[in-house]
Amino acid sequence: MYKRQATPCAAATIGAARAETFLGRCDRATRATLSVIREDPGNVSAYAARGHALCLSDDFDQGLKHLKEALRLDPDGADAQRAFRRMKKTADALTRARESFKRRAFEEARDAFTETLALADAPERSPLFAEVVSERAQALLRLRLHEEALADCDLAVAAREDHKRAYYVAGSCLIALGRPAEAAERLEVLLKMDPSDETTKKHHEKAVFETRKAKRPRYYEVLGVSSVASVPEIKQAYKARCMEWHPDRHATKSDEEKALAERNFKALGEALEIMEDPMKRKLYDEGYDKEAIAERAEAARRAAHRGG
């Protein structure tokens, strides 16, 4: 079969496109090679370069079609042959990874995502790299390998700063690691990029909620009772603890000890107020802090007043 030679101008464009692909700027590469194909529909190198760039954009359907076209035009083309075999194996590994994740076989998914990255040899700024590491992060999150998942999320965001899945997974990991304030900060960055995104809002609200929850006084510990203690048990514990921490019993002690007694005595009063009220206690057990509980209690009071 006759192999059409690229013009010097087309060859330069294709060379630049390959360089863009190497840097992960696959969108530029696909645009450049498309312009060559439109001018010269028989350009083998353009099809091969465009096919490779499309695969690294996570568009294997179109990418493999272009590589096949390059092979149709030049069946003996070694570069296109190698690229087609490698990208086909990459696509198959990625399909296995995604199917494993759907089946909740998370270890298999993690391994298949790792295999995908090895086969693709994708630049770290390419769309495929960002997508695969973010999906692997999801599998790692399900395996409770939170630090590893966070590392993958960082890679995904470095490749694409607005990669939503990476932000969401990172937020979940940080909350699981007891670092909800960091989760809220990260998600706030994404929220500023797209303030109207409802999913991002929900993830951010959860992180803020968990941050406030982590800062709450631990009222059960303050009272020295279990989370299933009855109201009479709570009141009995309250009286005993008040005897222990009443400021009058610490009047002759150091300023530091007196301040501690005052804080603990105040916390006991707050704990009793919430724990002896069924609605407030339920809200506390659900994770709400003192301010949020007061807001909801007031809203319920107003609603009851209107209903009456």
Which residues does each PLM region occupy?
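N-terminal J-domain/J-like co-chaperone modules of DnaJ/Hsp40 proteins
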Residues: 189-192, 196-271, 275, 296-299
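Helix-start (N-cap) detector for alpha-helical repeat units in TPR-like alpha-solenoids
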Residues: 10-11, 44-45, 78-79, 90, ...
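Short coil turns that delineate tetratricopeptide repeat
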Residues: 6-7, 41, 75, 121, ...
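Short, small-residue-biased leader/transition segments that mark boundaries at the very start
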Residues: 1-2
